């Protein structure tokens, strides 16, 4: 694998900062080989001061010598960025996109470039505890696959899939997943306060219960339903609570919500394709 690659990140937001921190933590490349390009001078200065990377405002100049270009912009800014970068990236460079809904074909057409990885990280990636699902175009070399794997591993766990359709599925399940978890946590905390706990104690109980349950599951070699049954005594409090959740359609609501997110992800992707036709 290439040593000390030149890496340019377009769109220096929170996820981009997580990538920068991870790259430096893993010593994948030195800070002087990392460029963060964005319109805000103060943001570039902040990243330079904190990490020692190079801030740019002109995307075309930023990608000129890049071995890897990471697209980390909002979907609504993608059209402008692709228009700027079309034909500007070295043919042998690897492009990694974390733009939600942007397909390999959309990116390839917009950039006039065909060596592309499409990925979907999630919010915990900002502390190195995320999970990223990714797919590589056929033109990505084995060496670049390994480089992409190391870059995405800076965000937490990573899963390379063989079908790009899995990216829309991942958007609905893991990409949007933290929102479901936070809503569930909020509901549990509010229920605890309703029972009479001070909010501080309710929050502590919920957080540790979730953390401990996940750790416990990962240390067992059984199906998650078996663990649920294990803590559900006939006629007990767990059985009563689960009865009400099932009666309220808890499981169905989750399934339908994730399916709706999946359909919305596909819609957004089609919208991006249509908006980029006129580039």
Language-model regions, residue ranges each:
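Internal alpha-helical scaffold of NAD(P)-dependent oxidoreductase catalytic cores
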Residues: 106, 110-115, 131-169, 180-219
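A short glycine-threonine-serine/GTX helix/turn-capping micro-motif
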Residues: 170-179, 228
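Conserved small/polar residues in nucleotide/adenosyl-binding loops
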Residues: 277-279
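Rossmann-like NAD(P)(H) cofactor-binding subdomain of soluble oxidoreductases
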Residues: 35, 41, 50-51, 59-134, ...
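Interdomain hinge/lid region at the active-site interface
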Residues: 184-274
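NAD(P)+-binding Rossmann beta1-loop-alpha1 motif at the extreme N-terminus of oxidoreductases
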Residues: 1-57, 61, 130, 193-195
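Short, well-ordered alpha-helices that flank and scaffold nucleotide-derived cofactor binding pockets
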Residues: 17, 21, 25, 49, ...
């Amino acid at each position: 694998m290439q040593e000390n690659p030149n890496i340019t990140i377009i769109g220096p937001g929170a996820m981009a900062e997580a990538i920068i921190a991870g790259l430096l933590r893993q010593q994948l490349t030195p800070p002087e080989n990392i460029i963060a390009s964005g319109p805000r001078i103060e943001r570039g200065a902040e990243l330079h001061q904190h990490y020692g990377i190079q801030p740019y405002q002109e995307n075309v100049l930023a990608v000129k010598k890049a071995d890897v270009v990471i697209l980390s912009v909002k979907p609504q800014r993608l059209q402008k960025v692709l228009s700027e970068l079309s034909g500007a990236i070295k043919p042998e460079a690897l492009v990694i996109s974390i733009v939600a809904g942007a397909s390999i074909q959309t990116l390839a057409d917009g950039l006039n470039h065909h060596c592309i990885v499409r990925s979907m990280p999630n919010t915990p990636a900002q502390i190195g505890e995320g999970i990223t699902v990714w797919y590589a175009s056929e033109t990505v070399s084995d060496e670049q696959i390994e480089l992409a794997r190391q870059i995405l591993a800076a965000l937490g766990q990573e899963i390379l899939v063989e079908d790009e359709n899995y990216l829309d599925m991942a958007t609905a399940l893991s990409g949007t997943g933290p929102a479901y978890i936070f809503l569930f946590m909020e509901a549990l905390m509010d229920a605890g306060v309703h029972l009479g706990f001070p909010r501080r104690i309710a929050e502590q109980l919920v957080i540790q219960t979730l953390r401990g349950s996940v750790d416990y599951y990962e240390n067992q070699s059984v199906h998650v339903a078996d663990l649920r049954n294990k803590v559900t005594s006939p006629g007990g409090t767990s059985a009563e609570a689960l009865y009400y959740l099932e009666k309220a359609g808890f499981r169905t609501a989750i399934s339908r919500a994730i399916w709706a997110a999946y359909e919305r992800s596909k819609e957004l992707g089609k919208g991006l394709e249509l908006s980029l036709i006129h580039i």
